[in-house]
Amino acid sequence: MAKKITAYIKLQVKAAQANPSPPVGPALGQHGVNIMEFCKAFNARTQGIEPGLPTPVIITVYSDRSFTFETKSTPASVLLKKAAGLTSGSAHPNTVKVGTVTRAQLEDIAKAKNADLTAADMEAAVRTIAGSARSMGLNVEGV
């Protein structure tokens, strides 16, 4: 018989920088999960990602207090801000434009996010990322 699932925990943790401090410690501690074991496994799995980029993770906790986790790709908004050299998007995206991204940058982001997107092909993925860029107040060149 399969192990009984007791909780799903969704967090955003900086790649290769997980530690027992909030938000990781309290979220895992209340379910009885070994926090240091998770931190070591997460840091090992995210070695290939640029350190410090927020990485979404879904942790499945079982009744025997064991766990498994799945990492997702960095959010598109973070990658777009990095590509445009910004710290935040526009407070009024329809009227105040704060930066510009090119089609080549959108294609790079779409390739990085491709596993998590539901787009049928790369062109649809680029259009999805372009829509996210516009909603952040970025001008999109070449789309």
From Swiss-Prot:
Source species: Pseudomonas savastanoi pv. phaseolicola (strain 1448A / Race 6) (Pseudomonas syringae pv. phaseolicola (strain 1448A / Race 6))
Superkingdom of origin organism: Bacteria
Protein role: Forms part of the ribosomal stalk which helps the ribosome interact with GTP-bound translation factors.
Cross-referenced SMART domains: RL11
One term under GO cellular component: cytosolic large ribosomal subunit
Keywords: Methylation, Ribonucleoprotein, Ribosomal protein, RNA-binding, rRNA-binding
InterPro entries with a match to the protein in the record: Ribosomal_uL11 (IPR000911), Ribosomal_uL11_bac-typ (IPR006519), Ribosomal_uL11_C (IPR020783), Ribosomal_uL11_C_sf (IPR036769), Ribosomal_uL11_CS (IPR020785), Ribosomal_uL11_N (IPR020784), Ribosomal_uL11_N_sf (IPR036796)
Pfam families, sorted: Ribosomal_L11, Ribosomal_L11_N
Keyword RNA-binding tagged: yes
Self-association state and partner proteins as the record states: Part of the ribosomal stalk of the 50S ribosomal subunit. Interacts with L10 and the large rRNA to form the base of the stalk. L10 forms an elongated spine to which L12 dimers bind in a sequential fashion forming a multimeric L10(L12)X complex.
Any one biological process term the GO annotation gives: translation
CDD domains in the cross-refs: Ribosomal_L11 (cd00349)
Protein name: Large ribosomal subunit protein uL11
